[in-house]
Amino acid sequence: MNHQIVILGKEILSVYHGIKEFGPDMVHFVCTEETNQLPDRILPLLPSSIQHKIYHVQPYDARTVAQVCEQIQKENEGFFAYNLSEGTKLMTLGAIYIVRKYQAKAFYLTPNREIVHLDTLEKELMHTTLENHEIVSLSGNHLAEYHNAKDLAEADIDASASIKNFIEQHPKEHARLQKFFGIFCRRDLINLPASKLFQDGLRYKQRDGSLFIYKENQPLLSLPHTNACHLYFEGRWWETLVANQVRIWSNKQSSPREVWQSVLFQSNKQDTRTKNEVDVLLNNELKLMFIECKSGYVSQNDIYKIDAVRETYGGDISQAVLASYYPIAKDLQDKCADLQIYLFAPKTADQRIDFIYTLPDRLDEWSGALIL
């Protein structure tokens, strides 16, 4: 029987990933009062064939840790491996004492998907990766709904590109329509009239989701697409274009990454309401990258929201990106830097036209930074 002895610490991903990578028959969780709830998050994700036991120790008592590990060795037979990626230094020292005494194996998992074998200090890449749903579950959160970006409809992408061109060619008309939607419709499509004629000759028509915009009877934007109003008025056109570029980048990787769009989370088990928390979610192997897409004005509250979402659903090792269609004020750029939020935004309004196509290059840069 293969046994894996796991020293639990505050971070849970390396613990679960070590189990997934090696597939032991029995897992021995060595935890403290502060970490004794972590196995409850891990166990539902494990195959039913994997057995487990839980042991309690003090975080700074190396002797007790050594005694527990020796008890495990004496009461069981088979192969023993220790995951020493987490826990306090004294817990690790207590475990290492038993590793040496019984000539067991021990390993450490690094943030860049490497296994360090502690007996030889040799490194090798892990063979498994963590999926989005696993990382979210391990953070103690619950997915309600998401759309896989690999299933993005070409019609949505084309319509979003047309909306972008309309905004760049007719900024005043776009501002007028968005102001009407914000003030008179309270940013809810349910309140959007079937048509509206403005005093300057600007007019729109919408039916069953399609959208047509005219100026003095000259067509400015024609979208017979059933999702057009949703894309234009709610700003989802920018989210769609960003998600498409992230998808393009992912498909070029040797191991394509998961890309989700419009991710809904359930706040907790008692509260069944859902909230659209994440525009685009990228699984950069062991880390989640949360991408907030802003097609309009960006406030300081938006930046705080991005930071809070990252902390709630991804933890310390995740990253956040603010992808803005418009340039960002200097004070907001500084705030992003202070909170370690990557910023994807044009420096000037003129750069907006082709700026979206530079996102894959930035993802190359950020992806490398994530594993340092």
Each predicted region: which residue ranges?
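Intrinsically disordered, low-complexity Ser/Thr/Pro/Gly-rich regulatory segments
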Residues: V136-L372
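Structural motif
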Residues: H3, V6-K10, M26, C31-E34, F79-A81, L84-E86, L264-F265, K287-M289, ...
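A broadly used, surface-exposed interaction patch
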Residues: M26-S85, M91-A104
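N-terminal beta-strand-loop-alpha-helix module at the start
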Residues: M1-R41
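Mixed-charge intrinsically disordered linker/loop segments at interdomain junctions
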Residues: T92-S162
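Short beta->alpha junction loops
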Residues: I7, K53-V65, K294-Y297, Y325
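Short, aromatic/basic amphipathic alpha-helical patches
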Residues: G18-K20, L38-S48, A95, K330-Q340
